[in-house]
């Protein structure tokens, strides 16, 4: 009689360039990965042209338009492009594992 076990691994990445990999060494396993992306505080330096540093204080990206339009990439709060907002990626990996027969 084999028992199936389910394991959930959650990881939060603050950098979009961070890559992670999961490996399994079991005889019978399956996994799925779910990623949620959100854009938080704006990091645009509004004083760069005068040699200073000043951000506008926008805390979270809110799309100015519906998905598929140009305004979907512009923040309704600060007017900046979405790329100026820090990207957070929440990744959840769900694995189902059946131990090998002994």
Curated annotation (Swiss-Prot):
Where does this protein have compositionally biased stretches of type Low complexity? 14-32
- Which Gene Ontology CC terms are recorded? cytoplasm; nucleus
Molecular function, one GO term: zinc ion binding
Q: Name one Pfam family in it.
A: ZF-HD_dimer
| Annotated compartments | Cytoplasm
Q: Which InterPro entries match?
A: ZF_HD_homeobox_Cys/His_dimer
**Region of interest (Disordered), ranges:** 1-34
Q: What does this protein do?
A: Inhibits zinc finger homeodomain (ZHD) transcription factors, such as ZHD5, by interacting with them to prevent both their nuclear localization and their DNA-binding properties. Involved in integrating signals from multiple hormones by preventing the expression of genes involved in gibberellic acid (GA), auxin and brassinosteroid signaling and by promoting the expression of abscisic acid (ABA)-responsive genes. Regulates several development aspects, including photomorphogenesis, apical dominance, longevity, flower morphology and fertility, as well as root and stem elongation.
| Subunit field text | Homo- and heterodimers. Interacts with ZHD1, ZHD5, ZHD6, ZHD7, ZHD8, ZHD10 and ZHD13.
Name this protein carries in UniProt: Mini zinc finger protein 1
